[in-house]
Curated annotation (Swiss-Prot):
Protein function: Hydrolyzes broad-spectrum beta-lactam antibiotics. Active against all third-generation cephalosporins but ceftazidime.
Native source organism of the sequence: Klebsiella oxytoca
Disulfide bond sites: none
Keywords: Antibiotic resistance, Hydrolase, Signal
PANTHER family: BETA-LACTAMASE (PTHR35333), BETA-LACTAMASE-TYPE TRANSPEPTIDASE FOLD CONTAINING PROTEIN (PTHR35333:SF3)
Record GO biological process: beta-lactam antibiotic catabolic process; response to antibiotic
Signal peptide (residue range): 1-27
Pfam families the record matches: Beta-lactamase2
Gene3D superfamilies: DD-peptidase/beta-lactamase superfamily
Active site (UniProt): S72 (acyl-ester intermediate)
UniProt protein name: Beta-lactamase OXY-2
Gene symbol of the encoding locus: bla
Length: 290
């Protein structure tokens, strides 16, 4: 059964599917559930949504505990792992890595310009988060010691769901039922909150991650498109086979505590086109009553 609920994080997961977590709902939970259901049916795919309202720790979930291919949204965890190392060694982010022609993979708009000069880990992190540069992601993974080290970092911050198994671009195959390189909307939302608003990173490192996310250049048609223009958004998009279209975001509405929103979407046809408008619509549905 699809879960679509407001609830306190501390409440038992077995609570009723549509549960009032605080004194009042932003909008009717029945209406939110129905709108997300209708959106999913119209889209012809499978939609996953997790929203955390940090004002009262309430949540709204739609397939929140189902696995989805993360695609490039996993880059947040990799960059955060680098930042974590810089807490004990500030020079880590200044370490320069060589970039060879053999390293380049599809969609590397930044790294392909630095074959002679190389790039620092800070520059690679910015490139992979703000331009979704795939070679930058692979170089970061290589520096960390492989995909399993990114997963180990996720475990260290309390995420038992995240798993990174491959590198770019194969981590984007998004084969239905394949658990490689997947997480759930709720697990990713909780981790994103810890990394950007919590204490999983030191203050300086947390601020740097937020700055990178706010400077993302690829999310204008996804979550951001479903929100008021005055709201500040830091996000990371992702895309893969089976029309997989993802976006994870930290949102700062006007006169309200931050929100954390994860939207994952995938389709049954391997060659299906990306559907960023579905993510924008989902973002509007879950925030329009705020």
């Amino acid at each position: 059964m699809i879960k679509s609920s407001w609830r306190k994080i501390a409440m038992l997961a077995a609570a009723v599917p549509l549960l009032l977590a605080s004194g009042a709902l932003w909008a009717s939970t029945d209406a939110i559930h129905q709108k997300l259901t209708d959106l999913e049916k119209r889209s012809g795919g499978r939609l996953g949504v997790a929203l955390i309202n940090t004002a009262d720790n309430s949540q709204i979930l739609y397939r929140g505990d189902e696995r989805f291919a993360m695609c490039s949204t996993s880059k947040v965890m990799a960059a955060a792992a680098v930042l974590k190392q810089s807490e004990s060694n500030k020079e880590v982010v200044n370490k320069r890595l060589e970039i060879n022609a053999a390293d380049l993979v599809v969609w590397s708009p930044i790294t392909e310009k630095h074959l002679q000069s190389g790039m620092t880990l800070a520059e690679l992190s910015a490139a992979t988060l703000q331009y979704s540069d795939n070679t930058a992601m692979n170089l970061i993974i290589g520096y960390l010691g492989g995909p399993e080290k990114v997963t180990a970092f996720a475990r260290s911050i309390g995420d038992a769901t995240f798993r990174l198994d491959r590198t770019e671009p194969t981590l984007n195959t998004a084969i239905p039922g394949d658990e490689r390189d997947t997480s759930t909307p709720l697990a990713m939302a909780e981790s994103l909150r810890k990394l950007t608003l919590g204490d999983a990173l030191g203050e300086q490192q947390r601020a740097q991650l937020v700055t990178w996310l706010k400077g993302n250049t690829t999310g204008g048609q996804s979550i951001r498109a479903g929100l008021p223009e005055s709201w500040v958004v830091g996000d990371k998009t992702g895309a893969g086979d089976y029309g997989t279209t993802n976006d994870i975001a930290v949102i700062w509405p006007e006169d309200h505590a931050p929100l954390v929103l994860v939207t994952y979407f995938t389709q049954p046809q391997q060659d299906a086109k990306n559907r960023k408008e579905v993510l924008a619509a989902a973002a509007k549905i879950v925030t329009e009553g705020l």
